[in-house]
């Protein structure tokens, strides 16, 4: 059996895997255990009561967290004319059409989010094999193919997170940094839960939000007591 590191032993001793923690208690514990030499992200895993094998039960979308994610986001936009100017004014780092596509084909991808106006998809469509595997392909379901590219840029900059369940029906995303105060992390989590509830498939049966766990980049998962989240109980 692999030998436990000192850090892993501390986590094992501090975290009760059988317990559901109040959100404030959970955040305090995560902060205590976040000893990496960088500011760790706070990640969430939400187990949904869906059958991920059925296409009509898959959950996908995006929402802007009230306090952002703490990340600096670089945005690339495929647009032309007035839309291109609007994207630049909104803060997009890269704006173009064929010229931007050529950069990407050369492997120049210094961006985190790609947004496209509908008329630009004829250009973006050529990049599916490059952007798709990296989770960067624009998609109308998450608001990254839109006639209002300026709003999409502002949302990306403001802390929008995209979510999509995996094959086990679990949503994985980030809700902030470990140096956020507890109330901001709680409000970000509640905002995500509200978005997930709104996205509930009509065919999903039984308990929808089955389990919520928080963890830091280098830490263990802590299960959350959902009764302490107003978004869940109201």
Curated annotation (Swiss-Prot):
Lineage top rank: taxon: Bacteria
InterPro entries: Ribosom_uL1_bac-type, Ribosomal_uL1, Ribosomal_uL1-like, Ribosomal_uL1/biogenesis, Ribosomal_uL1_3-a/b-sand, Ribosomal_uL1_CS
CC per GO annotation: cytosolic large ribosomal subunit
GO molecular function annotations of the record: rRNA binding; structural constituent of ribosome; tRNA binding
Pfam families: Ribosomal_L1
CDD domains for the chain: Ribosomal_L1
GO biological process: regulation of translation; translation
Keywords: Repressor, Ribonucleoprotein, Ribosomal protein, RNA-binding, rRNA-binding, Translation regulation, tRNA-binding
Gene3D superfamilies: 3.30.190.20, 3.40.50.790
Family affiliation: Belongs to the universal ribosomal protein uL1 family.
Subunit composition and interactions: Part of the 50S ribosomal subunit.
Free-text function comment from the UniProt entry: Binds directly to 23S rRNA. The L1 stalk is quite mobile in the ribosome, and is involved in E site tRNA release.
Name of the protein in question: Large ribosomal subunit protein uL1
Organism the protein comes from: Yersinia enterocolitica serotype O:8 / biotype 1B (strain NCTC 13174 / 8081)
């Amino acid at each position: 059996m692999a030998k436990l590191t000192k850090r892993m032993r501390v986590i094992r001793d501090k975290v009760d895997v059988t317990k559901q923690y109040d959100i404030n208690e959970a955040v305090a514990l995560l902060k205590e255990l976040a000893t990496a030499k960088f500011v760790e992200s706070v990640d969430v895993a939400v187990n949904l009561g869906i059958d991920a094998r059925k296409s009509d039960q898959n959950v996908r979308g995006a929402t802007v967290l009230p306090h952002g994610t703490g990340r600096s986001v670089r945005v690339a936009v495929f647009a032309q004319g007035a839309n291109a100017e609007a994207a630049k004014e909104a803060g997009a780092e890269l704006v173009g059409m064929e010229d931007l596509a050529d950069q990407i084909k050369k492997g120049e991808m210094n961006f985190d989010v790609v947004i496209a106006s509908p008329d630009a998809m004829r250009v973006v469509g050529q990049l599916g094999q490059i952007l798709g595997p990296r989770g960067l392909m624009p998609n109308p379901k998450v608001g990254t193919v839109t006639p209002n590219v300026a709003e999409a840029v502002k949302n990306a900059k403001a802390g929008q997170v995209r979510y999509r369940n995996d094959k086990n029906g679990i949503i994985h995303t980030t809700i902030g940094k470990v140096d956020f105060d507890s109330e901001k992390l709680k409000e970000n989590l509640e905002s995500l839960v509200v978005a997930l509830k709104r996205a509930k498939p009509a065919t999903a049966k039984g308990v929808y939000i089955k389990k919520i766990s928080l963890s830091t980049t280098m830490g263990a998962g802590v299960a959350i007591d959902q009764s302490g989240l107003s978004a869940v109980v109201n």
